[in-house]
């Protein structure tokens, strides 16, 4: 359905419903309770469009930045078939007060590989894609400590500002090095990163090959357009807490200072989670539903 909620209707310090567009038509829905669940990008944007004025609204956006290291195996892997996500490792999940990274196996469909593999020339890219059946990957999922921000432009469209901090980049560098070691131990005969330039090494290049490769990875860089980074989980832009100066919703998921207005999604996480967030999201929604239902 072509429907977009543009704002929450506030009467004084109380939410009484929402205003939406349905195709060319305007729609108003009045309700005793309004629950925002647009995710960590659109929930803060909706609250900002509605005139909610809290100092941390849209801030602290966490993304679980993710990348991978690839390895070419002698045997056929066919990374697009079989169990989609069957293994993970939390060996490095707590490098510093709960922050670190996880390894996860994820499928590499040809379209995704074409996006992630470095581009040197059409011929090189074609040759690399023909080797895809023999490619394995170590997926990296970073628990980011230092977040970004969601704002809105003049039309109310969400605008995301995010850059991986020096602190989180240090964990990213360690993750890439550890992923290469993992693939090497698994038998990879060539290992590379999804950077904008071809940065690879072969374990048979002799002692110190991986360390020399690490220097070239650093030289290729970790900034935007240097390294392919994706986000699977957006969190913490309407974070929960007891103080309106440092959070957006209270422990009952109600927006500070506004009656009848609640947020129930991953944006209410106080920080990035240390694991995939789906169970926590469901738990938050279940608890919020019980609290709201009891109050109506």
What are the language-model segments listed below?
Residues 54-183, 190, 217, 223, ...:
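FAD cofactor-binding and catalytic pocket of flavoenzymes
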Residues 29-30, 38-45, 56, 167-174, ...:
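Generic recognition of stable, solvent-exposed alpha-helical segments in well-folded globular domains
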Residues 13, 24-26, 155-156, 253:
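Detector for glycine-centered tight turns/loop "hinges" at secondary-structure junctions
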Residues 43, 145-149, 247:
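Short, acidic Gly/Pro/Ser/Thr-rich loop/turn segments
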Residues 3-8, 16-88, 265, 284, ...:
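Glycine-rich loop(s) and the adjacent beta-strand/alpha-helix scaffold that form part
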Residues 271-292:
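A conserved FAD-binding loop/helix module that cradles the flavin
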Residues 37, 49, 143, 175-186, ...:
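Generic, well-ordered alpha-helical scaffold segments in large soluble proteins
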Residues 4-11, 189-271, 278:
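A glycine-rich dinucleotide-binding beta-alpha-beta segment and adjacent secondary-structure elements
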